[in-house]
Amino acid sequence: MAYPMQLGFQDATSPIMEELLHFHDHTLMIVFLISSLVLYIISLMLTTKLTHTSTMDAQEVETIWTILPAIILILIALPSLRILYMMDEINNPFLTVKAMGHQWYWSYEYTDYEDLSFDSYMIPTSELKPGELRLLEVDNRVVLPMEMTIRMLVSSEDVLHSWAVPSLGLKTDAIPGRLNQTTLMSTRPGLYYGQCSEICGSNHSFMPIVLELVPLKYFEKWSASML
């Protein structure tokens, strides 16, 4: 989860988020090099009197500043497209969970089970226990097995919402009348927090998401106790 004065991303917990972090660092390096070059040229122009007032054309320079940006864009676009296709790929999900957005709570349905569904509301600040997080805790957590491919179906009952868990690299819009899907897989157990990421009314800030990723045997015990 995020913490005060944090400058970077949350720790990656899924393969997709790890790829996104690598892509961020890759792109940031390119942007840093371009910015350094531009600042160097500007400082050179301001501190020297070297000019080329007699130059009418420079085919070599024009060729370079046409080809070089194209190469840079390709270096950014190729890994970006790779990650985009990885995020859309769904292969043999172990479990399917449907998340429905409401004003202002989430409801979940485990579609592989006959009767396993519940609503998830934020716990008010006055009811928090010691050690619990303000505005992030819910009364019913989404319990999922770790190291398994989970398919999430996301929609809404009323207005636009967005189901987002940053540490897993997830953000899927919840649109009324439309069913969007995404996949998640956690590489380690733990609690992972998210929030609605689409302004949806006065209580938009009070729609937290809590995923509890556990080993498969504990998930089976939990699902049996919920039926």
From Swiss-Prot:
Which Cys pairs are S-S linked?
Answer: none
Could you state one GO biological process linked to this protein?
ATP synthesis coupled electron transport
What general EC class does the enzyme of this chain belong to? translocase
Positions binding Mg(2+) in this chain are E198
Quote the subcellular location field of this record.
Mitochondrion inner membrane
Topology Mitochondrial intermembrane: residue spans: 1-14, 88-227
Q: Which residues lie on this side of the membrane: Mitochondrial matrix?
A: 46-59
Record's GO cellular component terms: mitochondrial inner membrane; respiratory chain complex IV
Which molecular function GO terms apply here?
copper ion binding; cytochrome-c oxidase activity
Function in brief: Component of the cytochrome c oxidase, the last enzyme in the mitochondrial electron transport chain which drives oxidative phosphorylation. The respiratory chain contains 3 multisubunit complexes succinate dehydrogenase (complex II, CII), ubiquinol-cytochrome c oxidoreductase (cytochrome b-c1 complex, complex III, CIII) and cytochrome c oxidase (complex IV, CIV), that cooperate to transfer electrons derived from NADH and succinate to molecular oxygen, creating an electrochemical gradient over the inner membrane that drives transmembrane transport and the ATP synthase.
Please identify the protein, giving its name as recorded.
Answer: Cytochrome c oxidase subunit 2
- Can you name the source organism? Bison bison (American bison)
Phylogenetic lineage: Eukaryota, Metazoa, Chordata, Craniata, Vertebrata
**Gene encoding this chain?**
MT-CO2
